[in-house]
Amino acid sequence: MRTLWRWLGKGVAAAVALVLLYQLWIFAHVLWWIDHDPRSTAFMETGLARQQAKNRDAVLRHKWVPYDRISNNLKRAVVAAEDARFVEHAGFDVAGIQKAFQKNVKKGRLVAGGSTITQQLAKNLFLSGERSFLRKGQEVVITLMIESTWSKRRILEVYLNVIEWGNGIYGAEAASRRYYKKSAATLSRDQAARMAAMIPNPRWYENHRGSRLYQRRVVLIKRYMGSVAVPR
């Protein structure tokens, strides 16, 4: 029996060590990306694999642009659409989490996350798209890492450059070229609102921008984008 407990203890210790090593690996990347731009993300790699399963020659459309070369209209539209209190909180919107919790309890499963921009970025950079409490817990840890080391400006810059904006389309510049044949720096207020409205389900909205739901989102974003604060 003692031998069994000894081996069990060693197994638990090894598992804990592996978890800690994984957290250190993630934190090392977070620190590196303070002033180095991510070349790819977990979501990009998943998206590329999905496309190459249908066409092995498929490539992603993605071009990094610095924060100052992204329209203020798009920054405001995205913050208004996804996280109106972005500059105020430390990575978590308590009101949003409460609403998501109530929705999850009502459904009896994890269907909503109340995710802030930083939480979405954590997921995009490192995690899969599955919904589970374990993955949500890891998302929280990564969010804390990012918020404790990056400026809000850097968080929004990386977010705008890596999120999905359609099938195989990642980042503001590639999306702006795809939908409006222009640079992300020159997006108008209306164009920015329309791009921001796609974020919750970009591959669907890419071909359904005439839907009522999409149009309602655009109207709401345009109504509130002038009143939100964004990093300078």
Swiss-Prot record:
Any one of the GO CC terms: peptidoglycan-based cell wall
EC number(s) per entry: 2.4.99.28
Enzyme type, top EC level: transferase
The reaction(s) this protein catalyses: [GlcNAc-(1->4)-Mur2Ac(oyl-L-Ala-gamma-D-Glu-L-Lys-D-Ala-D-Ala)](n)-di-trans,octa-cis-undecaprenyl diphosphate + beta-D-GlcNAc-(1->4)-Mur2Ac(oyl-L-Ala-gamma-D-Glu-L-Lys-D-Ala-D-Ala)-di-trans,octa-cis-undecaprenyl diphosphate = [GlcNAc-(1->4)-Mur2Ac(oyl-L-Ala-gamma-D-Glu-L-Lys-D-Ala-D-Ala)](n+1)-di-trans,octa-cis-undecaprenyl diphosphate + di-trans,octa-cis-undecaprenyl diphosphate + H(+)
Intracellular or extracellular location(s): Cell inner membrane
Pathway info: Cell wall biogenesis; peptidoglycan biosynthesis
Molecular function GO labels: pentosyltransferase activity; peptidoglycan glycosyltransferase activity
Record keywords: Cell inner membrane, Cell membrane, Cell shape, Cell wall biogenesis/degradation, Glycosyltransferase, Membrane, Peptidoglycan synthesis, Transferase, Transmembrane, Transmembrane helix
GO biological process terms, semicolon-separated: cell wall organization; peptidoglycan biosynthetic process; regulation of cell shape
Domain of life: Bacteria
The keyword Glycosyltransferase is annotated on this UniProt entry: yes
Location, primary (coarse class): membrane
InterPro entries linked to this entry: Glyco_trans_51 (IPR001264), Lysozyme-like_dom_sf (IPR023346), PBP_transglycosylase (IPR036950), Pep_trsgly (IPR011812)
Membrane topology: Single-pass membrane protein
Keyword Transferase found: yes
Membrane-spanning intervals of the chain: 14-34
Record family assignment: Belongs to the glycosyltransferase 51 family.
Chain's role: Peptidoglycan polymerase that catalyzes glycan chain elongation from lipid-linked precursors.
Cited NCBIfam families: mono_pep_trsgly
Protein name according to UniProt: Biosynthetic peptidoglycan transglycosylase
Gene: mtgA
